[in-house]
Amino acid sequence: MATNHLVLSGTITRSRSFKSPAGIAHSVIMLEHKSQCFEAEMLRNVYCQMQVIFSGERFESVTEQLKSGVDIEVQGFIALQQSRNGQNRLVLHAENVELKT
């Protein structure tokens, strides 16, 4: 079995919550990540934005806290998602989240 696990920290810039037609609670956020990493012995500024999806009852206790400006660390798996206009993008499906204070 192939490995698919990502850990990413950052600041929430957007959030929304909804229930699927099956009644499953979902929260979707945009996570903005900024860091510095070494690559080829050079310090590199790293920046990305990634959509993160929180699904199911286990995240209901933190849903109210997933608001713009909150710093979090999230662990999960990435998957391809196609938007209505046909654009493909990677999204992170959360398996664990830690609020940073």
UniProtKB/Swiss-Prot annotation:
Homodimer. Interacts with PriA and DnaT. Component of the replication restart primosome. Primosome assembly occurs via a 'hand-off' mechanism. PriA binds to replication forks, subsequently PriB then DnaT bind; DnaT then displaces ssDNA to generate the helicase loading substrate. Involved in the restart of stalled replication forks, which reloads the replicative helicase on sites other than the origin of replication; the PriA-PriB pathway is the major replication restart pathway. During primosome assembly it facilitates complex formation between PriA and DnaT on DNA; stabilizes PriA on DNA. Stimulates the DNA unwinding activity of PriA helicase. Residues 1-101 form the SSB domain. It comes from Shewanella sediminis (strain HAW-EB3). One of its GO terms (biological process) is DNA replication, synthesis of primer. It comes from the Bacteria. The keyword DNA-binding applies. One of its GO terms (cellular component) is primosome complex. The gene is priB. Belongs to the PriB family. The keyword DNA-binding applies. This is Replication restart protein PriB. One of its GO terms (molecular function) is single-stranded DNA binding. Keywords: DNA replication, DNA-binding, Primosome. PROSITE patterns: SSB. NCBIfam families: PriB_gamma.
